[in-house]
Swiss-Prot record:
Function according to Swiss-Prot or TrEMBL: Component of the ribosome, a large ribonucleoprotein complex responsible for the synthesis of proteins in the cell. The small ribosomal subunit (SSU) binds messenger RNAs (mRNAs) and translates the encoded message by selecting cognate aminoacyl-transfer RNA (tRNA) molecules. The large subunit (LSU) contains the ribosomal catalytic site termed the peptidyl transferase center (PTC), which catalyzes the formation of peptide bonds, thereby polymerizing the amino acids delivered by tRNAs into a polypeptide chain.
Protein known as: Large ribosomal subunit protein uL13
Subunit structure and binding partners: Component of the large ribosomal subunit (LSU). Mature N.crassa ribosomes consist of a small (40S) and a large (60S) subunit. The 40S small subunit contains 1 molecule of ribosomal RNA (18S rRNA) and at least 32 different proteins. The large 60S subunit contains 3 rRNA molecules (26S, 5.8S and 5S rRNA) and at least 42 different proteins.
Similarity comment: family membership: Belongs to the universal ribosomal protein uL13 family.
Recorded GO MF terms: mRNA binding; structural constituent of ribosome
Organism name: Neurospora crassa (strain ATCC 24698 / 74-OR23-1A / CBS 708.71 / DSM 1257 / FGSC 987)
Species classification: Eukaryota, Fungi, Dikarya, Ascomycota, Pezizomycotina
Entry keyword Ribonucleoprotein: yes
Compartment(s) of residence: Cytoplasm
One GO BP annotation of this record: translation
KW Cytoplasm (keyword) present: yes
Entry superkingdom: Eukaryota
Amino acid sequence: MSSFESVVVIDGKGHLLGRLASIVAKQLLNGQKIVVVRCEALNISGEFFRAKLKYHSYLRKMTRYNPTRGGPFHFRAPSRIFYKAVRGMIPHKTARGAAALERLKVFEGVPPPYDKKKKMVVPQALRVLRLQPGRKFCTVGRLSSEVGWKYEDVVSRLEERRKAKGAAYYERKKVAARQLSEAKKSAKVNDKTAEALKEFGY
């Protein structure tokens, strides 16, 4: 992610939560606009039971006088958990940090128009490259559903629909490419057209 682009769309599946958050935070402060999709498929290192205990410990932290108003506010959705991880790595109470957070968008699943855009991965944050083989891990989506997130089945159903649509589009694209190559092979060019093409270097 060294080169600057207008908007970078990152597929969160298979990335470690903290490592991806640190890289995203740095790029946001540099002025890059970033969209992270499929936050429910982000990974957390360590076994699920340990992550759940840590989250329940976090849920017990509150203000004494008015928790509903004074916070801290405990986010359950995977996208908001990732957002809060990034926010903790940015000076969000300054103008520079607030402007950086404005450049971040996070989603569960892959909503339009990002389903038709090229998505990237961050090798420095991929679990298969950063964790040793055999190490335990869990997904943010499973943790969220255990602590109160209610939309895991909705997101999974929409994802299945999106994948089916994408597979059908790819099959149509393969058929069209095959027909085009066959048409190019069988196309006949008369002498006049061949001379005109030769004049332009074809």
